[in-house]
Amino acid sequence: MSPQTETKAGVGFKAGVKEYKLTYYTPEYETKDTDILAAFRVTPQPGVPPEERGAAVAAESSTGTWTTVWTDGLTSLDRYKGRCYHIEPVPGEEDQFIAYVAYPLDLFEEGSVTNMFTSIVGNVFGFKALRALRLEDLRIPVAYVKTFQGPPHGIQVERDKLNKYGRPLLGCTIKPKLGLSAKNYGRAVYECLRGGLDFTKDDENVNSQPFMRWRDRFLFCAEAIYKSQAETGEIKGHYLNATAGTCEEMMKRAVFARELAVPIVMHDYLTGGFTANTSLSHYCRDNGLLLHIHRAMHAVIDRQKNHGMHFRVLAKALRMSGGDHIHAGTVVGKLEGERDITLGFVDLLRDDYIEKDRSRGIYFTQDWVSLPGVLPVASRGIHVWHMPALTEIFGDDSVLQFGGGTLGHPWGNAPGAVANRVALEACVKARNEGRDLAAEGGEIIREACKWSP
């Protein structure tokens, strides 16, 4: 047995500290179709060889610890250990490298994003031998994907439920996010839906505060949905935020939403947690509710370039845990992102099969097999003049989520919603006619304004 793959069972127990690379750095390893693969951006402490640090990440996120233990001899370390199988430099960064780690599938509980993250990122990020560590991407094998239900319904089923095809969906987050009474909140919902939006939305921190308890909000929003549907002849929805302090309370709110016969509820999946999110997703599938996901707290995890996790990892985790929509940032507006990178994880949310493409930040080919897709939500700081770019960049399978871009209209909420809908339909029509939205977008919208209701 080579020194890189030796186990304590094979050589006998010897107490003491041992270099990680002797056991966990295996450059000759050929990855298996059933392995979970991870790409870590590693910033080591000075003077530590990359092979040792990459092996340390593999060890501390799988079977290893800081010293040799005699109980290694009671199991097959070769079967269960993580392996650092490849190291590559990061262009333009002298003190960083990418460590590729393969984890055997037996290390993970079936259908549990919680367990997957607890194993891979739960402990190693505090490792003092590393200055910083970032999980850039994961390859989830088909064998593990098939243990997850995934989104409650997916893109096609949602379109069938709403009877809306051939264009992005339109939404608006009600503002001010905090302080409105339930009745005034419901009034704003009604005005936006009547004006032409498909959805309105609770802000992520609207739960059940003293100024507006959740049950009152649900009732007034349901009334707004019924009234706007009757007037427009279209199916409407409001993302009723079911996030709560306990899973039991969250489920109680989801049950009440179902009793009101509304089409969709919402969850803050990072602050609420993956276990709660998966439970809610299962309930939504069983009871015909769509599930909108907000990513509140994501920047705490993904903003730093050398530490934490990239959002593409959180997006993959959400597709496994379950959600029909998720906020995915945008490449215009006040939270502008890198276009190719953003579209890379948008494709990871929507498509069945995504090829490796490092220019878009995709480190591994990902096959989702039959797992339904998730609609990306473009939001934050967008307005009608962004519509040509949004239509061209995100395509039909997306939700364009306005806020001030609807409610800030000088004539009020309903005219703001009308402006959103007119601009969208004008851009979609022009695109379908073969016109260049990038060059003619402003003219297209100005022309549509002359004939708007």
From Swiss-Prot:
Q: Which residues carry this modification: N-acetylproline?
A: 3
What protein am I looking at?
A: Ribulose bisphosphate carboxylase large chain
Asked if the Swiss-Prot or TrEMBL record annotates the protein with the keyword NAD, the reply is no
For the ligand (Mg(2+)), the binding residues are: 201, 203-204
This entry carries the following GO cellular component terms, namely:
chloroplast
Q: According to the UniProt entry, what is the EC number of this protein?
A: 4.1.1.39
> Which residues are catalytic?
175 (proton acceptor), 294 (proton acceptor)
What species is this protein from? Galium scabrum
